[in-house]
Amino acid sequence: HSECLTGDALGSLKCDCGEQLEFALQNISLLGGMIIYLRQEGRNIGLFNKVNAYALQDQGFDTIEANHQLGFKSDERSYEVVETILEHFKIDKIRLLTNNPKKMSCLKNIMIIERWPIIIPSNNHNVDYLKTKKEMMGHLL
C-alpha cells in the first residue's frame, strides 16, 4: 500500500486509499498476510505537491493532468523494494491484493499465485478519480 495521509489517516473522500487499506487489513486479519506500507505519498510526489494537485483537480483537471501541470509523471511510484522485502522474509510466492497492474509487473522473482481485487464503491467525490485510474492508468476496477 502506498502511503496516503489524506485517505489513510484523515478519511479523505477524494480517493479510495483509506478504504483500500481498511479492506486489506480486514482480509489479512481473517486470512493472514502482510501489508507492505510504502512511503510514496501522492503517487510519490509528496504531500505538499499532492495538496496542490488536489487544488488543480478542484479546478477541473483530472488526477493525471494535475500531476502533469505540476511537472510530474502520472505515477512516480516504484515497487522494486517490495521484492526486496519479500525476499528478506523468504517469501517467493504470494496472493496479491491489488487493482494496480504496475504492482504485479514489477515482481520479477516473486510468483503471484492469485490477484485479489479490492472492491470499494465509489462516492460523489471520487467517481471521476476512479474512472481516470481505470481508463487512463489501467487499474483493474
Curated annotation (Swiss-Prot):
EC numbers on record:
3.5.4.25
Q: Which residues bind Zn(2+)?
A: C4, C15, C17
Cofactor binding, note field: Binds 1 zinc ion per subunit.
User: Which Gene Ontology CC terms are recorded?
Assistant: cytosol
- The protein's enzyme class: hydrolase
**Catalysed reactions, as listed in the record:** GTP + 4 H2O = 2,5-diamino-6-hydroxy-4-(5-phosphoribosylamino)-pyrimidine + formate + 2 phosphate + 3 H(+)
Outline what the protein does: Catalyzes the conversion of GTP to 2,5-diamino-6-ribosylamino-4(3H)-pyrimidinone 5'-phosphate (DARP), formate and pyrophosphate.
Which family is it part of? Answer: Belongs to the GTP cyclohydrolase II family.
Protein name per Swiss-Prot or TrEMBL: GTP cyclohydrolase-2
Designated gene of the protein: ribA
